[in-house]
């Protein structure tokens, strides 16, 4: 499981797994941002894991699915650019490498045209404590 803290919630009399995932971002200019996801998981009849998630800066609902060690989902956010905002879509592919590391390739698009791409690495547990905390000012 590449996600964080789990709990179970009741929805229409049915138990649904809920996951809380906290992402901490540190940008090159020193700005910090945190996104806290609340994600609900269901499983389709054919065994595909379906996910719906919300975070404060996400427009609407993020939706995705997982099969094996691969996870895909998409969501919209308003990116702050100077004094204005640009609504873009993120399409994330996340691959669980082992119990501690996941790689996320996110493509950013506007009107269906790719305008950017970012690759993130999620590290947790013992490996995270060995390499952390990360200090971008040392680069």
PLM segments and residue spans:
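Central antiparallel beta-sheet cores of small beta-barrel/beta-sandwich binding domains
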Residues: 1-81
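Short coil/turn motifs at beta-sheet boundaries
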Residues: 14-18, 85-87, 115
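Solvent-exposed loop/turn segments connecting transmembrane beta-strands
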Residues: 29-31, 83-85, 112-116
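Charged, gly/pro-rich active-site loop segments
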Residues: 81-86, 91
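Glycine-rich, aromatic-bearing surface loops/beta-hairpins
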Residues: 89-93, 97-139
């Amino acid at each position: 499981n590449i996600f964080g803290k789990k709990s179970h919630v009741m929805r229409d009399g049915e138990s649904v797994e809920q996951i809380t995932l906290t992402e901490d971002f540190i940008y090159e200019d020193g700005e910090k941002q945190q996104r806290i996801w609340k994600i609900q998981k269901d499983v389709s009849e054919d065994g595909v894991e379906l996910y719906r998630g919300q975070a404060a800066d996400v427009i609407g609902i993020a939706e995705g699915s997982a099969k094996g060690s691969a996870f895909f989902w998409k969501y919209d956010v308003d990116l702050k650019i100077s004094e204005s905002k640009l609504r873009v879509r993120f399409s994330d592919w996340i691959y669980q490498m082992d119990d501690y590391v996941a790689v996320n390739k996110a493509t950013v698009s506007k009107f269906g045209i790719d305008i950017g791409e970012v690759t993130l690495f999620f590290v947790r547990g013992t490996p995270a404590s060995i390499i952390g905390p990360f200090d971008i000012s040392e680069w």
